[in-house]
Amino acid sequence: MIFFFKKRYHVFLKAPSIRLMPCSFFFFRSFIKVIFIIRCIFFSSLSGDSCPTQRSRSTLACMFTSVPVAPTVVPGVVYSSGVHEEWKEAEQKLLDGCLIHSEGDGATKQIKEKLTSRNSQSVRCDLCAKMIESRDEEQIQEHFQVHHAALSLWCREILASKDNLLHYGCIPSGHIVSCGNFVLESAATLDMGRKTFDVIERAFSQMSQVISCFVRNLVLFPFGSCVSCGCWDGVSDADFTAIGLQDMKKGKWPPEDEKKVILRLTAALRKAGFFFGELEPLVRTRVPVVRRVQKVRVPLRSHGEHDTYSVVWSNSKEFSSPPRMLVEAAISSTVERKDSDTVTFHFKDSLKAVKFFCNSAMCGPRDMEVSWKTGSQLPEMFSLDFDLSCRAQGVRNSLFLRKYFQQDPFVRTGYLFLKKWSKLYGINNAKNGYLTSYAMSILWVHFLLENGLVKFVRPADVEPIPDLSQQKMSYLPLLRDDGDGGERPSDVLKSPELTMLRGALGGLIPLFFLYYTRIRWDKVVVTLRVPGGGPPVTPDSLGWVEANEVKCGPLRDRVWYRLCIDDPYEDNFNLGRHLSPDKASFVKVQFMRALASIVAGRPQQLLVDEQKFAEETMPAYVTRLSVQGELRNLRPVTVSALRQLLIDSAGADCVAIYEASHNWETLLDMASTLNNKSKEGDDDAEGVTNNQEGEPPDHVESCEAPRRHLLCSKMHSIDDALLVAGPLGVSDANIPAGLLGVYFLARGRAFRTAEDRDNFLMHAEAVSAARARGCTTREEILERVADAIPSIVRNGTLLDDLLVSGSEENITVQSPVVVETRCAETVQRKKSKGSKKRKNAVRRGNHAGQGTCSECGASGTDLWEASDKSADDGLYCGACWKAYNCQKN
């Protein structure tokens, strides 16, 4: 009957006489909806729905809104994943505020009730982000005792030794000189010169053109370290913000629909040629942004006189006269006609090329396709990673800090070095709830103010509403007050003009760590609102006390006052609000450890990526323990027992740093798997016995227990060989398959630790890059290496081994030109209209366990196979499948 009504309904719509009867049409449409509701109630009662009335209300709401209703799951029925994926997508969109709905929307209420009940029963750990399925305080403490006990004990022991560190006395002058040399050499690589800074300026102009073309009434501004410090290292992310100046002057900015503005900006960038997968709109953060991260980073190229930017314009239908935009583009470019429907425009000016591309994508004919020519030079905006928001505070903050940083080179140089140090030591990581680069700049400037080393700048001296003149980014050399910058690290130590700067940095960096080791965080608020030298601002005066902390709720809503860093402009806003007691202790410990490294004369330890080493070292030591048979006594394997074994082997520092951002589930599963495999081998060996003497036969004895002993013996012999080989390592051809997880491999060599491997890679890549640039003599190569590796880190023995003829057979030398060409060939950016979906496109198939992604190379992640293995037999992670689906759609 339902089919009959639907069929008659469609015939009814086609009848021409009905168009003159709007009233009859309205009543018939209402009748069909009533029949559809009755059908839903009937089938929901058959499927065992406990509340068919509520189900029908949700269905009725779905007919008038765009929110999909949660599917009713019938036991014993296998459903396709598409319905549930749609439900999850709608839930995510509702959380992000992307759906428009009314208060009485039934589907909206279902989603809200589901989320509320789920959030009310669980809480997320602020260290490892694991969901704890209860808000009970005992279970929360149990989670911390199980997964983060080593971190807590490690922090307590180091903080208890603070008095011993402070009573050490004066730092030897030789260590201060070493620190100054290392800081200056490292900082020299953070400013690539005026020509490199021009790249980000041109990229900003191109981004401004894109925004003005697709999103009206918004003006793009730069901010961040490129504005405050006036230089760029050619690698760091850029920060941009799109602001409605007219609305801001009326007090209507940021807009209420800020999340929708971010989505509009994302759509505009995609229309300009950015891939779907490399743009990620983050609308659930405190400041919504769209983040661009490249999977294949395009090498930077300085603009040359003969550079051209090619746009391919094609149309499937011929037109009598060319559109006006083509005529205008032909005037300012070189036109190359390939066939009757494809034209290539070669522009000398990248900004004109971007303007033509955007106008074509927005106003071109319907059957038109415009793309950036594969293999040709791309505009500079495609070579940057960036964050794009629509808040104005970042512009004001950057201009305010620039007034401090431009006072003296040591101010901006010290900040950029500390910014790099804080990222490597894990305390500058806003994504995981630690400090931001902006907070680190406040800490540095506050320290300088308290010691009278910079002049006080009133925050009110910077206007809250940006001016159009502030769109221009002016270059400021890092190490000098004037010039083109781009100092070579090998020259900065020889320059007599930088002697004072080197001495200032060598003394101030240790004093900075000493200042924040001594500070009483419960008595002092770090602020730039008052001049230094006066009475400190206390947490009590601002109400930033423990009694006012928000300890529950979502991570982004929790507020702590263990480390108080005052924002210069936003009232009652603590930049350290996400530092829980455990995180605050970790930050304090890192300040102390940095000071201890300088006191011990090892400043190179300041730029060691401890987080990365811990993530790589822990699985390797679990494998080593399995080979040694240490895990066989742990049945079952527990976290506490495994933790103690790793502390004894890898060290307490490595385990604690790992626990600062991870839990033990992955390592526990790995250890249990290895232990079960070992146990299966033992059971097989014990099951085959000699009937007379109860001993295993010879073939079992030779295959099981001796095999483990041989593997362990081989591992010890490799360890001895590594001690003899030194920093060059040994050939990975000597590593058996069962020991590949124990050692760290790179360029055909094997190493005992991840730090040894990275040290080898640093030297090998420096030598390879020098040879690729045409350096042939030993002196030329060493000169290039001196620009890439600080003197205190440079290993002469390793360089001698690498420069001996024939010793670099396993080191791949890849020319930068080859890399650049390969990147240009793989990046194909186009915007087409009226394109059809691929009929035989593969979809995500079954879960295939964990491993290495065939696309991005991420290891230790969940993988899914393709639905059609004959078309694609790879295994890909969730992020790559998401990017593939976006591009496919």
Curated annotation (Swiss-Prot):
Residues 675-702, 829-849 are annotated as: Disordered. Transmembrane segments: none annotated. RNA binds at R286. Keywords: Cytoplasm, Magnesium, Manganese, Metal-binding, Nucleotide-binding, Nucleotidyltransferase, RNA-binding, Transferase, Zinc, Zinc-finger. Gene3D superfamilies: 1.10.1410.10, 3.30.460.50, 3.30.70.1970. Its EC number is 2.7.7.52. This is Terminal uridylyltransferase 3. The lineage of its organism: Eukaryota, Discoba, Euglenozoa, Kinetoplastea, Metakinetoplastina. The gene is TUT3.
